[in-house]
Curated annotation (Swiss-Prot):
GO CC list: Golgi membrane
Glycosylation sites: 24
Species in which this protein is naturally found: Scheffersomyces stipitis (strain ATCC 58785 / CBS 6054 / NBRC 10063 / NRRL Y-11545)
Family to which the UniProt record says this protein belongs: Belongs to the TVP18 family.
GO biological-process terms attached to the record: vesicle-mediated transport
SMART domains: Cg6151-P
Name of the protein in its database record: Golgi apparatus membrane protein TVP18
Annotated TM spans: 25-45, 48-68, 100-116, 123-140
Signal sequence extent: none
Domain of life: Eukaryota
Annotated localization: Golgi apparatus membrane
């Protein structure tokens, strides 16, 4: 019993619109962070072919993308075997202020890359800055830290959702 692509995209976009209707900056930060993951991986690989010290920042960018993936999608910590120390380190970012600091530190690292050469890594720095700003606004306005409400497998009441959750439970 396979999921249709249409139902998956329908669930994603309905969850996305529900998240934006909540007007919570931590959700905005999470979505900007997810976009940052894609940008980190794509632009990190694209800039790795420079014949200068930019290669170092490209490698850092790829690593940042992988770490942000684990921060924004913590279920991957259960799937992938990591040390307890690393897992606890990632779990420290389950609040607005720590995530704000995490993203702003990542942004600062990528902003430093401009000193070497202006490359497309500036886009990653901008997105990290925006994500950090969203988490900072959430913390300043005392909004609670929320996670996205997207259910890729469907709502728990639907047959697809129940099957999807059962499959995920069996995998974990």
């Amino acid at each position: 019993m396979a999921f249709s692509i249409q139902s998956i995209f329908s669930n994603i976009f309905s969850g996305l619109s529900a998240d934006f209707k909540k007007k919570n900056f931590s959700l905005y930060g999470q979505w900007v962070g997810i976009i940052s993951i894609l940008l980190c991986l794509a632009l990190g690989v694209a800039n790795i072919f420079h014949a200068s010290i930019v290669i170092v920042f490209s490698i850092i960018c790829i690593v940042q993308g992988l770490v942000v993936t684990l921060v924004e999608m913590p279920f991957l910590l259960k799937i992938c075997p990591f040390t307890e120390t690393f897992t606890n380190f990632i779990k420290n970012f389950d609040a607005n202020w720590p995530r704000c600091g995490f993203y702003l530190l990542n942004a600062a690292i990528q902003w430093v890359s401009i000193a070497v050469m202006a490359t497309s890594l500036i886009v990653v720095a901008c997105f990290f800055t925006v994500a950090g700003g969203c988490y900072a606004l959430a913390a300043i306005t005392h909004q609670e830290y929320l996670k996205s409400s997207i259910q890729v497998t469907g709502s728990p009441d639907s047959v697809e959702g129940q099957i999807g959750q059962h499959v995920v439970r069996n995998v974990l």
